[in-house]
Curated annotation (Swiss-Prot):
Pfam family name, one: 7tm_1
Protein name, UniProt field: Rhodopsin
Location of the region described as Disordered in the Swiss-Prot/TrEMBL record: 353-376
Chain positions found as N6-(retinylidene)lysine: 321
Chief localization: membrane
GO cellular component: plasma membrane
């Protein structure tokens, strides 16, 4: 069954005991919120309270893990002298964005799931959606800048101009300036923020049929989905190509020296290109699975591709918020120097006792970037 097709109404009934008659998912919405509700949602019966309970529990767990994980990344990178480098400023910014996203969005969602509707009023609805858009956009473009930094270091090599603290801060300021711009447009009439789905969350209005509103979704998707995704794919494609060419040169050099490999015996079985290809595939795949459900839902709304159910919007929310949980693992904990600092400050929480070359590659050669910046 398609994500956006008409849902199975067993998801909205009391354990199959007859349904709700003429009740709808909108019935519990506060009177002052009704002018924000699209007529589309009145066709759906109330959701089974178990779904609200499950959603609240999962969002609460994701929020706790994300706040702790990203908080530790910020603390370790900020207090460890060897990690305070230009490239790692981007990693800290990503952790900062994800930290604030879940800190600001998880508690309201849990509260609303408890009451089975949005109970915090119109202003908080707008603020909730605004913060979700702000931190989501900030995280997306920070990941783009990290990919471009790795491309600059690995593909261009010595010919590349190393990133300094000043250029890193300028990029971060640019990220937040652009994110704020995209976030405030709906407050001035280009689209708007409204309750959606099971009425426990708010987001952009993708059901409005006016082209002024639709145009915001289209332009926003270009600059906050398609362009970032294309840039990340482009960067990692050429990174893998560059590492592959380097591996080929190493094999040829080893052949001339009449040795099996220039690598240590420990790493001889797995080439750097294979490891980095896996990392690139993982990075792109996680990004794709985090944000694509929202894009599909938004486009389904503005182009009327199918009937969007409240249940579908739940999955969109979960996938996007899960991104804030695994980002600290992909971009922070995989960094060998980070793990060494973690082992020193929190021995019981350390992921590994010793950093290794594989982990260094898993961090996307950030260490190489750091050393190059330091030598500039």
């Amino acid at each position: 069954m398609s994500l956006i097709n008409e849902p199975s109404y067993s998801a909205y009934s009391w354990g199959g005991q007859g349904g709700y008659g003429n009740q709808t998912v909108v019935d519990k919405v506060l009177p002052e919120m009704l002018h924000l509700i699209d007529p589309h949602w009145y066709q759906f019966p109330p959701m089974n309270p178990l779904w609200h309970g499950l959603l609240g529990f999962v969002i609460g767990c994701l929020g706790f893990v994300s706040v702790v994980g990203n908080g530790m990344v910020i603390y370790i990178f900020s207090t460890t002298k060897g990690l305070r480098t230009p490239s790692n400023l981007l990693v800290v910014n990503l952790a900062f964005s994800d930290f604030l996203m879940m800190l600001s969005m998880s508690p309201p969602m849990v509260i609303n799931c408890y009451y089975e509707t949005w109970v915090l009023g119109p202003f908080m609805c707008e603020l909730y959606a605004l913060l979700g858009s702000l931190f989501g956009c900030g995280s997306i473009w920070t990941m783009v800048m990290i990919a471009l930094d790795r491309y600059n270091v690995i593909v261009k090599g010595l010919a590349a101009k190393p990133m300094t603290n000043k250029t890193a801060m300028l990029r971060i300021l640019g990220i937040w300036a652009m994110s704020i711009a995209w976030t405030v447009f709906p407050l001035f009439g280009w689209n708007r923020y409204v309750p959606e789905g099971n009425m426990t969350a708010c987001g952009t209005d993708y059901l409005n049929k006016e082209w002024v509103s639709r145009s915001y979704i289209l332009v926003y998707s270009v600059f906050v989905y398609f362009l970032p995704l294309a840039t990340i794919i482009y960067s990692y494609w050429f990174i893998v190509q560059a590492v592959s060419a380097h591996e080929k040169q190493m094999r040829e050099q080893a052949k001339k020296m009449n040795v099996a490999s220039l690598r240590s015996a420990e790493n001889a079985n797995t080439s750097a290109e294979c490891k980095l290809a896996k990392v690139a595939l993982m990075t792109i795949s996680l990004w794709f699975f985090a944000w694509t459900p929202y894009l599909v839902t938004d486009f389904s709304g503005i182009f009327e591709w199918g009937k969007i159910s409240p249940l579908a919007t739940i999955w969109c929310s979960l996938f996007a918020k899960a991104n804030a949980v695994y980002n600290p693992i992909v971009y922070g904990i995989s960094h060998p120097k980070y793990r060494a600092a973690l082992n020193k400050k929190f021995p019981s929480l350390a992921c590994a006792s010793e950093p290794d070359d594989t982990a260094s590659q898993a961090s996307g050669a950030t260490t190489v970037s750091d050393e190059k910046s330091a030598s500039a």
